[in-house]
Amino acid sequence: MQEQYRPDMIEPKVQQYWAENKVFKAIKDESKEKYYCLSMFPYPSGRLHMGHVRNYTIGDVISRYQRMLGKNVLQPFGWDAFGLPAEGAAIKNKTAPAKWTYENIAYMKKQLQLLGFGFDWDREIATCKPDYYKWEQWFFTELYKKGLVYKKTSTVNWCPNDETVLANEQVHEGCCWRCDTPVEQKEIPQWFIKITDYAEQLLGGLDTLPQWPDMVKTMQRNWIGRSEGVEITFDVANTNEKVAVYTTRPDTFYGVSYLGIAAAHPLASLAAQNNSELAAFIQEAKNAKVAEADLATMEKKGMATGLFAIHPLTGEKLPIWVANFVLMHYGTGAVMAVPAHDQRDFEFAQKYGLQIKQVIEPIADEEIDLTKQAFTEHGKLVNSAEFDGKDFDGAFNGIADKLEKLGVGKRQVNYRLRDWGVSRQRYWGAPIPMLTLENGDVVPAPMEDLPIILPEDVVMDGVKSPIKADLNWAKTTLNGAPALKETDTFDTFMESSWYYARYTCPQYQNGMLDAEEANYWLPVDQYIGGIEHATMHLLYFRFFHKLLRDAGFVTSDEPADKLLCQGMVLADAFYYTSPTNERIWVSPTQVTLERDEKGRIIKATDPEGRELVHSGMTKMSKSKNNGIDPQEMVEKYGADTVRLFMMFASPAEMTLEWQESGVEGAKRFLGRVWNLVYQYQQNPAKTSLDLTALSAEQKVLRREVHKTIAKVSDDIGRRQTFNTAIAAVMELMNKLTKASLDSEQDRAVMAEALSAVVRMLYPITPHICFELWQALGNESAIDTAEWVKADEAAMVEDEKLIVVQVNGKVRGKVTVAADADEDTVKTIAFADENVKKFIDNQHIVKVIYVVGKLLNVVVKP
């Protein structure tokens, strides 16, 4: 081996070996335990970012470790290739989304290969390819036949000037991104999948996932939002209309003072027929497009409809108001308002002078002031007829029973979860496989017509989807009769909901999945991705697995046994303010820094000498120009160094602060490992280790080696605290660099230690370890080596080093047998020449012994 560590020479050679020998190709083998490790696949945006590198490094470390344990490891890779950004980029670069996407995939694949990830590239998937989305289209038609798919009108962002639907990202401050026309809310027919049919299974399944982060499970539970309540029907006075509400607080029913309805509720339209002021308010509320997350903070607005609901128990007339905080797609689109016991209802009632009736009082003697805020806790009932004095449970059941007997109420379990709207009025997505016949009937496309291929050679004008603009594209026939293809495309979450399963059989042509392959590899053993996917992708991923199970493709209930959510990668961000008061962000790579003695930044300047504001460590992003290019870092330091820093700088689930000084430190450490192997290689051991001929120092060094092996095995395998595993190897390296290589047994102990160090580092820094493994005289490649095992006997200490203090000050250290009792330790300690100086002619007051560690002798003259 050469004397200097040169990653630029080592890494390409090792990567070529892996590629030529298909080292990471996974083949089903029933005789071996399988391990399926999967990192969430990326959107091919053009360049890898450090968030990608962190995700895939974690996955690669786990995969390589599991392979060394003897498991049959599958680590595939692919591309979540459909999506809106491709359309914007195509318009900007005057190209087609497909061309832009495929170029990005090719470039990013080269970047990934530079980092040495052990992917099985034979299983590569790009979701924009017809051989992938064909089966998604087919599955959708099967779900339709099962009654799990339906079409209904739903609200979209509509630009009246361009006559086109806009994604949320294309609406800037309420206006169209392209022509600046105010955006309207428009109802159009869209396709939905009945995820609500699986709400209870999705909720219950969370209890079977002990190795998923609690935070993800809590977020999913809240998103599914199971509640038990009562649906109550009110008659509308002087009409034949009825209005239904759902409440989880029937105990407050006698305190209802008004009903709130959504702007899109049929009663609102009825009331607005002869009321132009109300009609204008309704239109304004519809166009405002309120997200559920904004409900708590937005200004509450409303207008009376002039209609009244009849309270089914008291006969009281309750005014019906259109309220901007009631959403048509949530619940029934109407709410019963109890201002005394709901803060939102209280604020609305105060604003519009509506009645506030107390029907709950605190159980304890607590002072409440209903002129200032609502009392929202459970309590006992007042002003509630025969239910006065009852607690929450008694009142819930009593009032629910009464409403059910009267035929105006029914107990109901509701979910916050809504059905999954999968229609997108965009071009770059998989076409929805439904056909409209001349008589208006809508039917699924037959299998022989699939895939319905998205044309790739298109011109983007930035207004209409090419398949909507080209009227001929939609024209087709079914059984010889004219029909029209659906011009909406699938939500891209469709593709990412089943890709993990297709990886088990990506070339399979006879169906969506090869059940034999799928059931060998699935469920995924380890899934890795950001927590930002908790309530979208990770919920659809679980839902789709249950759909695949019910279709007979898989036998497991959940798609992944274990989930790791890696933290974000942060970097310093710097800016200056332009003459127009705009923040201009400067890349950290262009910034000259001055630091104080503690390493804190005290001054930052750009290449023009401008003083910059340091806005701290923030998530790497294009908007703040603080992304660090992984490729540049690999070229500068080597892939192994980048990988090592990524795994060492922070626990995997926590944010990671990018510090180039830390990267330099990682490079220095690998240089030390290289140097130690090089020094050993100049005079290697010629005989094998003789455990019966070891000196005390050699035994201690061996003990440190095997303790490190045990810790690293536990840290990587069970705890997944990769940073502490690396720290343990670094600590061991400090001891090894000081160890003697003089005797044959010294060198034999070092040979064992270096073999262990190289194997422990291999999952993290595979290129250098590949080379060092060969330098240590191993004939086969390290890729097939077994994980190093700790020798339990070596870790047993037959001797202990005892620190001896006299009156709290260290006066000596003595070696005793590991099983020595206190009297033996005292005898040996008191015989130590240095200790004797401080206790001779002194009166021993007491002796404190901390077993196996410390002896403190308290003396006085």
Curated annotation (Swiss-Prot):
GO BP terms, alphabetized: leucyl-tRNA aminoacylation
Residues spanned by motif 'HIGH' region: 42-52
GO cellular component, one term: cytosol
Annotated EC: 6.1.1.4
Keywords, in A-Z order: Aminoacyl-tRNA synthetase, ATP-binding, Cytoplasm, Ligase, Nucleotide-binding, Protein biosynthesis
Motif 'KMSKS' region boundaries: 619-623
InterPro entries: aa-tRNA-synth_I_CS, aa-tRNA-synth_Ia, Leu-tRNA-ligase, Leu_tRNA-synth_edit, M/V/L/I-tRNA-synth_anticd-bd, Methionyl/Leucyl_tRNA_Synth, Rossmann-like_a/b/a_fold, tRNAsynth_Ia_anticodon-bd
Binding site for ATP: 622
Subcellular location: Cytoplasm
Signal peptide: none
Pfam family name, one: tRNA-synt_1g
Taxonomic superkingdom: Bacteria
GO molecular function: aminoacyl-tRNA deacylase activity; ATP binding; leucine-tRNA ligase activity
Protein transport is among the record's keywords: no
Catalyzed chemical reaction(s): tRNA(Leu) + L-leucine + ATP = L-leucyl-tRNA(Leu) + AMP + diphosphate
Family to which this protein belongs: Belongs to the class-I aminoacyl-tRNA synthetase family.
This protein's name: Leucine--tRNA ligase
